UniProtKB/Swiss-Prot annotation:
Pfam family, one: Treacle
Record cross-link Glycyl lysine isopeptide (Lys-Gly) (interchain with G-Cter in SUMO1), residues: 655
Region (10 X approximate tandem repeats): 212-839
Protein name: Treacle protein
């Protein structure tokens, strides 16, 4: 409370001080951050307070004489600070900082302690300059400084808003250390870290100046931030980053949080940072010198020094990243994640800019982002740097989250690092700018260089991390940072350009982070590795695109290794990693998914993720974007940053990345991230989303998402926005990235960027995406990545449109990646996604996801999973709907939920994160989320969809809403039920946790499942194909899917049920090949959703947790199913045919994705129809579908039901429990809906009817499903029957198309099919 009170007291002072100083914008932002409409005139001004303090404090007295001169000198020297003597400046700076932000002074001292005299001096000058000066001065004084200020400011600002406000002034004064910490965090994490700070600063300072300054500035900056922001603006250009930075402020809130976290991390990292800082500094300085400094500074500031350094490194590019830090500020973790995301984003943007501008910059941005992330991460970055320098240090940041992991990650990192490095060089080279390269070289080189590069590498690492780290980076950073740091660095560095990618990753993370932030953090630590990989990915992405390929493999390897390596640590990390990667990939999604999966499969996923990432990497931008997006691409905004996911970091994507683990988790920024610039743009949007999501989610630190938001988010301060942003960012990045992450998605997926809300990401809140976003955004998704929300990233998914798509895809992928199930798939998915992502990404991203994913995945079982995941991701919407519903749901939730749910689910949702986390948690969360979240997911789904599929969102949104509404309405009932249960489920999450365990186990299975799915492949493929039929539609469908998710979400639960069934029916899945196809086909209406769900389920299926989640979800499903059924009348019908054909023709993986796509399509159509005909459709559907379905599905259903009933026994117990919570009914309903839908194909009405039956059936079905073996045979038979019937029904459906009722039926059929498919 004290802090809040102080903040309340400080804000007005800061606000007025800013106004007096002429920093109107900053003042306005402060006011916005504070949430107050007006500030009363303060009788006392900060200057008065500062003066008094100066006179009364020992420091003041000692420095008084000096200060007097200094103050004047500062004021006059505002622009000069950089050159001012650093010692005196330090002191002066301290004073100035103090003056500027009371808190700052102390920090300043710390800073001065920090030793970045130059920066301090600068800072001081800046400080003195007052905020206004700060901006300008900082800018001029030292670009760095400016950046710093910016960053600092942002962070500060955020902090301020958060707690940092106090931080800013009072705290600093009072809690100088404390505030500083946070602020420092922002700034440098200085206070506590004075030295740390210093180091941080150093790093930040990198440009030493910057950093020191940063610290002081941070508080100051914070105050100044706004202004600083401007001027530093880094100003805008170099400042692109700065621009990002500016957003940072928004982030700042996040930043504040981040700052706090960062502070902690920073402290840990401080040392590392310190050393690193030095190196970085050198590095930075080398690089920075040119313009970097200012940027760096800004960046540094933002990132908190680290970021800063990174920033510095990234220089301008980083600036934004810095901003991210600001973001970080709010959520240190998030911030970090976010930062990264944002950073990424910024980075991305900057990167883009930077890249042009300065490779280094790019790097830096990433690095910075990373830094940021690190910062948040902490120190991770620092640690990372440290790590580079001294892995351990890194650990700190990461350690913080992953300290333990750190080691692991480190190892992993190392490997990765090397791997990366190897690749990186390419990437780096690719990246090329000399500076960049250099760092890259260094980086690549490595590690050694790492150290050297620390700055670079470190930064790079950071950078890479950042973006990715932001998501991945973060994660990576953690991991990478730590160890990979170098590597990462290398990668990142190498990535310079990659950076963006990385940034993207970051973003993704952010998205995720946000949501995932937590996760991320955790993940991050763990993820880090992933991150690292992702980072690499990112960098690869960025860099390479060329590199990408190569890096990819390496990365992949790395990642894999990393992932694997990190897995343990990375479990979450993995997630994160994955995430990151995913982030990168999906960043958020990945994160999320990966996290989940990863957690579960982590290794796998990690690999997958990595793969994905890598896959994504190329795409990565998308992915990374996602990731980065998250990271923004995060920055995705960051251009890539968030990219979404990673995009650069936006983070949003949440996925952004951002994750600091927390962020990651939290954020989503979760969302994650992405497209570089475009992505960026989107990512940002997404990111925020993601971010927002995430924040809610994880960080709810919006930060996480915020992260995604990173810059965007920042801009989107709204964390939620952030989330979206995250997602969006993610998306964007994704877009850029392909929005790889489409947004956070990417890693943030869309954030990922998504983060949509940063992941909508954020799942945390949203989802949990650092971006992008997550809902950043994306978040998951990237969608969320998220922020991807749109995409997943909210971006994630779609949203940001591109990103989103990408994100979505990414997210999805990420998820897949995460799921990893299909590494390749993921990769492919990712890649695919990436491509499409970029293309489709936007709207279809999901679709793309689906398609791509599926396509890619199709080949691979993993792919399938990927598909699943992807699908999930893509589906984020769809998946969201289905798997995602669980996973996706998270995703979507992230996106959608991002905020809402993400928060709630927080974990779950981080879209990306969620995804990542989700995956691990996915079941859990999924369950959890699915239920609660899902319900929300439904609602969220909309959001998710919206977010995730932002692009799609509209359709979805509206439709979805209707649908969602319908479904939601119904769903909601269940949801409510479910929520209760859902939240029970959430609690169930515990169960789910168990489930998760199961899930984990199942996860293991999942891969198998995918294989099964593969088996199913033939049919499902067709189905999927059908889905794929219309990527765009798919997208829309996907949108629908989210809706479906809603449908599915509820449906998903249903799907989950289906999934459960799938799970249960895993046998069914096994039989799935046939059954799935047939059922899927037949069930398509339901199947579609169900399939989707099932797909999700499939994904989930593998996961027991999912089953449970399914069960938990079941309730939702039934309701959803009904509506879904109703909803997807015509489309469904169409789908069935196509689905059937496709199922027959295509491989399951594709099938799944496609199915989802078709489902989405159907859903979309249905949504529209539903809107118009929802009522009629429901009624007619009820009647006709009941009849038809009863006739058609009944036959099929009967077999299925029978099977299920038979199966029930096994699962009955299981189901009972699951369903018992409420899930029972819901589940039954869902199941029945599923079964009924599938089996009976009861449309809405029937669904209703069946619901009762369904409950029993569902339960039984679930039980039955549990008995895989029995189910299988029966299922196969059933499937065959269903297929026949489905065909019949298709005919009927066609007829019914005219009639809405048919739609529902077919929808159900499709769902069933899908369920079957997923089951497969």
């Amino acid at each position: 409370m004290a802090e809040a009170r102080k903040r309340r007291e400080l804000l007005p002072l800061i606000y007025h001080h800013l106004l007096q100083a002429g920093y109107v914008r900053a003042a306005r932002e402060v006011k916005e951050q504070s949430g107050q409409k007006s500030f009363l005139t303060q009788p006392v001004t900060l200057l008065d307070i500062y003066t008094h303090w100066q006179q009364t404090s020992e420091l003041g007295q000692k420095q008084k004489a000096e200060d007097d001169e200094t103050l004047q000198a500062k004021k006059s020297r505002v622009s000069d600070p950089v050159s001012s003597s650093e010692s005196s400046d330090q002191e002066k700076e301290e004073e100035a900082a103090t003056e500027r932000a009371k808190a700052t002074p102390r920090p300043t001292p710390v800073n001065s302690a920090t030793a970045a005299l130059p920066s301090k001096v600068k800072e001081k000058g800046k400080t003195k300059t007052a905020n206004k000066t700060v901006n300008s001065v900082s800018h001029p004084g030292s670009g760095k400084t400016v950046v710093h200020l910016l960053s600092g400011k942002s962070p500060k600002k955020s902090a301020e808003p958060l707690a940092n406000t106090v931080l800013a002034s009072e705290t600093e004064e009072e809690g100088n250390a404390q505030a500083l910490g946070p602020t420092a965090k922002s700034g440098t994490v200085s206070a506590g870290q004075g030295s740390s700070s210093s180091e941080d600063s150093s790093i930040s300072s990198d440009e030493t100046d910057v950093e020191v300054k940063s610290p002081a500035k941070p508080a100051q900056a914070k105050a100044s931030a706004a202004p600083a922001k401007d001027p530093p603006a880094r100003t805008a250009p170099g400042p692109t980053k700065l621009g990002n930075v500016a957003p940072t402020p928004a982030k700042p809130a996040r930043a504040a949080a981040a700052a706090a976290a960062a502070a902690v991390a920073a402290a840990a990292a401080a040392a590392a940072e310190e050393s690193e800082s030095s190196e970085e500094d050198s590095d930075s300085e080398d690089e920075a010198p040119a313009g970097l400094p200012s940027q760096v500074k800004a960046s540094g500031k933002g990132p908190h020094v680290r970021a800063d350094s990174v920033s510095a490194k990234g220089i301008s590019g980083k600036g934004p990243i810095l901003a991210t830090p600001g973001k970080t500020g709010p959520a240190a973790t998030q911030a970090k994640a976010e930062r990264p995301e944002k950073d990424s984003e910024t980075s991305s943007e900057d990167d883009s800019d930077s890249e042009d501008e300065m490779p280094v910059t790019v790097n830096t941005p990433q690095a910075r982002t990373s830094g940021k992330s690190p910062r948040a991460r902490g120190t991770s970055a620092p640690a990372k740097e440290s790590s580079q320098k001294g892995a351990p240090a890194v650990t700190p940041g990461k350690a913080r989250p992953v300290a333990a992991q750190a080691g692991k990650p480190e190892a992993k990192s190392s490997e990765e690092s090397e791997s990366d490095s190897g690749e990186t060089p390419a990437a780096a080279t690719l990246t090329t700018s000399p500076a960049k390269v250099k760092p890259l070289g260094k980086s690549s080189q490595v590690r050694p260089v790492s150290t050297v590069t620390p700055g670079s590498s470190g930064k790079g690492a950071n950078l890479p991390c950042p973006g990715k780290v932001g998501s991945a980076a973060l994660r990576v950073q953690m991991v990478k940072k730590e160890d990979v740091s170098e590597s990462s660095s290398a990668e990142l560095d190498s990535d310079g350009p990659g950076s963006p990618a990385k940034a993207k990753a970051s973003l993704a993370l952010p998205q995720k982070v946000r949501p995932v932030a937590t996760q991320v953090k955790t993940d991050r630590g763990k993820g880090h590795s992933g991150s690292s990989e992702e980072s690499s990915d990112s960098e690869e992405e960025a860099a390479p695109a060329a590199s990408a390929a190569q890096a990819k493999p390496a990365l992949e390897k790395q990642m894999k290794a990393s992932s694997r390596k990190g897995t343990p640590a990375s479990a979450t990390g993995a997630s994160t990693s994955s995430h990151c990667k995913a982030g990168a990939v999906t960043s958020s999604a990945s994160l999320s998914s990966p996290a989940l999966a990863k957690g579960t499969q982590r290794s796998d996923v990690d690999s997958s993720s990595e793969s994905e990432s890598e896959g994504a990497a190329p795409s990565t931008p998308r992915v990374q974007g996602k990731s980065g997006g998250k990271g923004l691409q995060g920055k995705a905004a960051l251009g890539q940053g968030v990219a979404p996911v990673h995009t650069q970091k936006t983070g949003p994507s949440v996925k952004a990345m951002a994750q600091e683990d927390s962020e990651s988790l939290e954020e989503d920024s979760s969302s994650e991230e992405e497209d570089e610039t475009p992505a960026q743009a989107t990512p940002l949007g997404r990111l925020p989303q993601a971010k927002a999501n995430p924040p809610p989610t994880k960080t709810p630190p919006a930060s996480a998402s915020g992260k995604a938001v990173a810059a965007p988010t920042k801009g989107k301060p709204p964390v939620p926005n952030s989330t979206v942003s995250a997602r969006g960012q993610r998306s964007v990045p994704a877009a850029g990235k392909a929005g790889a992450p489409a947004t956070q998605a990417q890693k943030g997926p869309v954030a990922g960027t998504g983060e949509d809300s940063e992941s909508s990401s954020k799942e945390e809140s949203d989802s949990e995406e650092e971006t992008p976003a997550q809902i950043k955004p994306v978040g998951k998704t990237s969608q969320v990545r998220a922020a991807s929300a749109p995409a997943k990233e909210s971006p994630k998914k779609g949203a940001h449109p591109g990103t989103p798509g990408k994100t979505g895809s990414s997210a999805t992928q990420a998820q897949p990646g995460k799921t990893e199930d299909s590494d390749s798939s993921s990769e492919e998915s990712d890649s695919d996604t990436e491509m499409p992502s970029a293309q489709a990404i936007k709207s279809p991203p999901v679709s793309v996801n689906r398609n791509s994913s599926p396509a890619v995945p199709a080949p691979t079982p993993e792919g399938v999973q990927a598909v699943n995941t992807t699908k999930k991701a893509s589906g984020t919407t769809a998946q969201s709907s289905s798997s995602e519903s669980e996973d996706g749901d998270e995703d979507l939730i992230p996106a959608t939920q991002p905020s809402t749910y993400a928060l709630r689910t927080s974990v779950t949702t981080p879209a990306a994160l969620s995804r990542a986390a989700s995956q691990p948690s996915k079941s859990e969360q999924s369950s959890r989320m699915p239920k609660g979240k899902k319900a929300k997911a439904a609602a969220s789904a909309q959001t998710s969809s919206a977010v995730e599929t932002l692009p799609m969102m509209p359709p979805q949104s509206a439709p979805i809403q209707p649908k969602a509404t319908n479904k939601l309405g119904k769903s909601k009932l269940p949801e409510k039920q479910q929520l209760a249960p859902g939240y029970p489920k959430a609690p169930r999450s515990s169960e789910d946790s168990s489930d998760t365990s199961s899930e984990d186990e199942e996860d293991a299975k999942r891969p198998q499942m995918p294989k099964s799915a593969h088996r199913l492949d033939p049919d499902p493929s067709q189905k999927e194909t059908v889905v794929e039929e219309t990527p765009t539609e798919s997208s829309e469908d996907e949108m629908v899917a989210p809706s479906q998710s809603l449908l599915s979400g509820y449906m998903t639960p249903g799907l989950t049920v289906a999934n459960s069934q799938a799970s249960k029916a895993t046998p069914r899945p096994d039989s799935n090949s046939l059954a799935s196809s047939a059922p899927a086909t037949k069930d398509n209406p339901d199947g579609k959703q169900k399939s989707k769900s099932q797909h999700a389920a499939d994904t989930a299926l593998p996961k027991t947790g999912r089953k449970e989640a399914s069960s938990g979800s079941t309730p939702q499903k039934p309701k959803k199913l009904k509506k879904s059924t109703s909803s997807s009348p015509a489309p469904t019908q169409t789908l069935p045919n196509s689905i059937t054909q496709r199922l027959l023709e295509q491989a399951w993986p594709l099938s799944e994705a496609q199915v989802q796509a078709s489902v989405v399509k159907v859903l979309t159509e249905l949504l529209e129809q539903e809107r118009l005909k929802a009522t009629e459709a429901i009624k007619e559907s009820g009647k006709k579908s009941q009849k038809r379905k009863l006739s058609g599905d009944l036959e099929a259903g009967a077999p299925k039901n029978k099977k299920k009933k038979e199966q029930p026994v096994p699962r009955a117990s299981a189901v009972s429990p699951e369903k018992a919570p409420m899930t029972s009914k819901a589940k039954s309903k869902l199941d029945k809906g599923s079964a009924g839908g599938k089996g009976k194909g009861s449309p809405g009405p029937q669904g209703a009817k069946e619901k009762p039956d369904g409950e029993l059936l569902g339960i039984k079905l679930e039980s039955g499903e549990q008995s895989d073996p029995k189910s299988k045979s029966k299922k196969k038979k059933s499937l065959k029957k269903k297929k026949d019937k489905e065909k019949k029904e298709k005919k009927k459906g066609k007829k019914s198309l005219a009639k809405d009722s048919a739609s529902p039926i077919q929808k159900k059929k499709k769902k069933k099919k899908k369920s079957a498919e997923p089951a497969v």
